[in-house]
Amino acid sequence: VYWGELNGRKMDFSTAEDRIAAYKWYVDEVRRRFDLGNYQYIDLAGFYIISEELVTPGDGWNHELKKSDEIIPPLAEYLHAINQSLNWIPYNRAAGYKKWQQLGVDYAYMQPNYFWEGQKSLSQFFSDVKANGLGMEFEFDENILEGEQNSDVYKKRFREYMEGAKKHGVYAVSYTHLRAHE
């Protein structure tokens, strides 16, 4: 898959090597532009993996395309060498949620996927989060606001997040993850 050129060489995104090179270029470019801003109250502390899955052989779909096990570790190593973190927010039980630390990700916050549908088991979610050293993403949107249709349902689900996080000790883990980079 042709992407463009980098340092005079045509990049082929079907290879992990070229994708890693492009990611490194992107990181360097973002840092360069950020440094030009001379921001007084903002720090660039890390980078975020947009994919909600980290696909490895036998875990997730289309490993041949995604190759997370080949791409994420060298990218994490590069980021760590320049004092940047690698962050990830998988959906509930996404591919890689048990392997994120092995791949070099620094902070991972799993989504409960409960706020909108309320059908998944929060008990299983909290068990998975604790067993795998994950933080929790507290999902919500404008539906929680007073005056929105069914806001009482969404408020109840959000309260269930908060109560479950406190009960299972997940609230402290998520907070500690955030404080670690200050």
Task: Please give the residue ranges for each predicted region.
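Conserved, mostly hydrophobic/aromatic
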Residues: 47
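Catalytic-core region of carbohydrate-active enzymes that cleave or remodel glycosidic bonds
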Residues: 128-134, 154-165
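Active-site clefts of carbohydrate-active enzymes
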Residues: 133-154
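Aromatic-lined carbohydrate-binding surfaces of glycoside hydrolases
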Residues: 1-33, 50-55
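Extracellular glycoside hydrolase catalytic/binding regions
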Residues: 26, 50, 54-71, 76, ...
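Acidic (Asp/Glu)-rich catalytic clusters
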Residues: 34-41, 98-102, 125-131, 165
